[in-house]
Amino acid sequence: MDQKKIDSLVKACRYSFISNKKNYCGTTDAFSEFKDFIENPLPEKTNKIETLFMSFEALYPYLKLIAKANKLSPLDEKVVDAYWIGNELLEKVSLDETKEMILADFVKPGLLPKSIALKKAESIPFGSVPHHSFHVLFINFVSRKVEPVLKNLDSCLISWGKIKEVKENSLVVDSVQLVFDSGEFKLKEKRKAIDSGLVSGAEKNSFVSVHWDFAVELIEKQQLKSLKHFTEKNITAVNSFL
């Protein structure tokens, strides 16, 4: 078994763990399988994990979209990284391809009504890329389980935090908060306490990615730079549409 494939699935499990635990997306209780795989990433478990990801009706279409444009598989390490953190693969996806994905994959019972999907597909902001921040800020939530209010958009967005204090079950981080001010989205600096999540070995002044106030993974400075870049790129694009 290719170690890169296992590493990719571990990363995918980390980013989808908390939203599934909250029952917002994916097969009910997939998070328990994800946690088990993160802690014991054995090759014989990979097929089941891959199948579970296919049940994520918002996430998996983006992975397929990015993969197809770059001639890779949906759960390739670079594809998973592109969607959650951001990398050069995103620039290979055309707006037309994103439009086709919205109409083909998001129009179904329990997701978007056709009228809303058409409206979204026809008005994709120029300069946007199919990063998780695009889904949060422009598509909002295809599931009716989550109300598209600012607090939820902020929580769902993958943010970052510089660790200032390590506690028993939480981390105090200097992070950012999504706000809506003067008719546009902005990121505002905010110190907050988050669940230490699945992160071990956290140290003061290291960086973590954050999803639903839950620490996802420790990230390097280049990952931090990419996450900021693609998040801010989509904020700028969506603001031009508002």
Which residues does each PLM region occupy?
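Long, low-complexity, serine/threonine- and charged-residue-rich intrinsically disordered N-terminal tails
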Residues: 67-100
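Generic detector of well-ordered alpha-helical segments enriched in charged/polar residues
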Residues: 7-10, 32-35, 39, 50, ...
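Anionic-ligand-binding alpha/beta catalytic cores of soluble enzymes and soluble regulatory domains
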Residues: 89-154
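N-terminal low-complexity, intrinsically disordered tails enriched in Ser/Pro/Gly
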Residues: 1-73
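Conserved beta-strand residues within beta-sheet cores
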Residues: 157-160
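Generic surface-pattern signal
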Residues: 39, 43, 54, 58, ...
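C-terminal, beta-strand-rich globular interaction domains
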Residues: 162-242
